[in-house]
Every structure is written in structure tokens, then in C-alpha cells.
Design a protein with these regions (language model features):
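Active-site-proximal alpha-helical scaffold in enzymes
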Residues: 83-93, 139-142, 147-150, 155-191, ...
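A glycine- and small-aliphatic-rich helix-loop capping segment at beta-alpha/alpha-beta transitions
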Residues: 27-31, 117-129, 146, 176-179, ...
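Acidic, glycine-rich active-site loops and adjacent beta-strand->loop/helix elements
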Residues: 19, 108-111, 161-165, 189-194, ...
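Cytochrome P450 core scaffold surrounding the K-helix E-X-X-R motif
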Residues: 22-24
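Condensing-enzyme catalytic core mediating Claisen C-C bond formation in acyl metabolism
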Residues: 5-16, 26-27, 31-50, 213-274
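Conserved beta-ketoacyl condensing-enzyme motif
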Residues: 13, 37-160, 193-198
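Active-site pocket-shaping loop/turn-to-helix segments
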Residues: 67-85, 130-138, 157-168, 219-236, ...
């Protein structure tokens, strides 16, 4: 059953930041939103040319610079680096510093899939696993590295709720703030799923786009006769604070959640009811 819960105290969203194919700065993102052209590119994945939406050139440069900024960062998955860059931008906008105590909950659905696939392929080939294979591919990898990068001393949580991961991070952040156990929380999600195995999984589900039209992703076309999903990559985070803040971009005044009774292993019904 869905639950709608009024908040006893308003939560302020004091900053939002993202890294995606649309860019990583507000002006660039808005300009690309207004561009009628897509951000799709063709990559050879899962043994064939595949449309995907990778990061824009500027974001890739910033990610590369971040990767080179610390010797430990060279071994991290892109999903971690995307979240780290977005988190840096968010707390800068919110005015948070290392003196602030804030929690972190940034999750991921696919997790460190690119790095995991590389490590698994090496194991299949050599029969040996690298020392860093486990610590760099665990689910807790994202929030813990963000905490390290931002020198945060608050609680850090990682989780995966399939397609609702980032929204559940907001729910978790609100719960922590309402409980009085934190005054500030950094929440969001990160995905870097443009890999052979991930694309193969989406094709096995029959949901990946096979269209060669000008707009191959028909997300708003309710009359389409086939699935047209195209994977992208990126991270989005926001800064939450308890109470009404003067610098708030928006306020959270209510939250909700629901649990679905599954009819099928891949969470679909016979008539595709939502």
C-alpha cells in the first residue's frame, strides 16, 4: 500500500548538482535541454553498434582530472567518480565545508559494473583476482569514497533500489533529518552502465531501443509498439537541510513510499500495468 506522510518539519533543498550527457553546469544543462538534437552516440557494445548517451566532453575532462588528482582514485569505477564530482559541485553551491557535519547517502542500481566486468574477465582469463577487485566493486564503494573526498565526518550509507535508488536516498535523508540525528544530508544516485554485459541484459529483457529513427527513444510516445529505452550515464545529488533555509531552492513538505507485490521475476505484469 502507498504511504503518504506529512512532514513534521520542512526540509530545505539548498543545492542540486549533476554530471550527465547534458553537462555539469546549470547554463550548459539548460542550453542542452532546449536543443532539439539528442545526446546519443553510437558505441560498439554487446557485439554490435549501440546507441547510448555518454557524458559530454567537458564532464569527461573533469572526470579524468579527478581520476588523476589522487593515486587512489585511479582504481575507482566511473560510477564513483561521477558521484564524487557531482557531490563536490553540490556542497560548493550549498556553502558546506569540511567543518560541517553532514550525512551522505548516494546509491546506485548497477553499481561498479564496468570495473566488475573487467575484474571478472581477468579472473576468467588468468584464474586470479586482483587485490582491489572486492573493495572497488562493493555497493558501499560510492558513499564511502565521497565521504573520503569531502572529508565528511557524518554517517554514510549506500543502497540499491533498482530504478528508485536516488529517490530513496532522498527519503532516507529526510528520515535522518527528521529523527534529529543529522542537520544536513547529501543524497542522490550515480550510474555508469554503458558496458557490454549491462547492454546485453537490457536486450535480453527486450526493452532496449532497436529504432533507427531520428529520435530513437520514444519516451513520451504512448502509441509506440515496441520498447525504446537507451541507457545513459551520470550522477545527480542534492543537499538537504532541516528547516526552512533562506538559500533553499525548494522545500520538501511531504514524502511517500510504496511496495509492489511482484507478479513476475522482472517486475512486469501480463498487461504492462504500472
Amino acid at each position: 500500500m502507498p504511504k503518504n506522510i506529512p512532514l513534521s518539519q520542512t526540509i530545505s533543498i539548498t543545492a542540486i548538482a549533476s554530471v550527465s550527457p547534458l553537462g555539469n553546469e546549470s547554463d550548459t544543462i539548460w542550453t542542452n535541454y532546449q536543443n532539439p538534437n539528442t545526446c546519443f552516440q553510437t558505441r560498439f557494445l554487446d557485439h554490435k553498434d549501440t546507441l547510448v548517451a555518454p557524458l559530454d566532453a567537458d564532464s569527461k575532462e573533469q572526470i579524468d582530472a579527478l581520476r588523476q588528482s589522487d593515486s587512489k582514485y585511479k582504481f575507482l569505477d566511473n560510477s564513483v567518480l561521477y558521484a564524487m564530482l557531482a557531490s563536490r559541485k553540490a556542497i560548493a553551491k550549498a556553502g558546506w565545508t569540511t567543518n560541517d557535519i553532514f550525512g551522505i547517502n548516494v546509491g546506485s542500481s548497477r553499481g561498479a559494473t564496468d570495473l566488475f566486468e573487467q575484474h571478472f574477465q581477468e579472473y576468467i582469463t588468468t584464474g586470479k583476482a586482483q587485490t582491489l577487485a572486492s573493495p572497488t566493486t562493493t555497493l558501499g564503494n560510492i558513499s564511502s569514497w565521497i565521504a573520503h573526498d569531502l572529508q565528511s565526518s557524518g554517517p554514510e550509507i549506500s543502497h540499491s533500489i533498482t530504478c528508485s535508488t536516488a529517490l530513496h536516498a532522498i527519503l532516507n535523508g529526510v528520515a535522518w533529518l527528521r529523527s534529529g540525528m543529522a542537520d544536513k544530508f547529501l543524497v542522490g544516485g550515480s550510474e555508469a552502465p554503458l558496458t557490454d554485459f549491462t547492454i546485453a541484459q537490457m536486450r535480453a529483457l527486450k526493452i532496449y531501443s532497436r529504432s533507427e529513427e531520428e529520435y530513437p527513444n520514444r519516451a513520451l510516445d504512448l502509441d509506440k509498439t515496441q520498447n525504446t529505452m537507451i541507457l545513459g550515464e551520470g550522477a545527480g545529488v542534492c543537499c538537504l537541510e532541516i528547516g526552512k533555509k533562506e538559500n533553499a531552492l525548494a522545500f520538501i513538505e511531504g514524502i511517500g513510499y510504496a511496495t509492489e507485490i511482484l507478479e513476475h521475476n522482472i517486475s512486469i505484469s501480463a498487461e504492462a500495468d504500472c
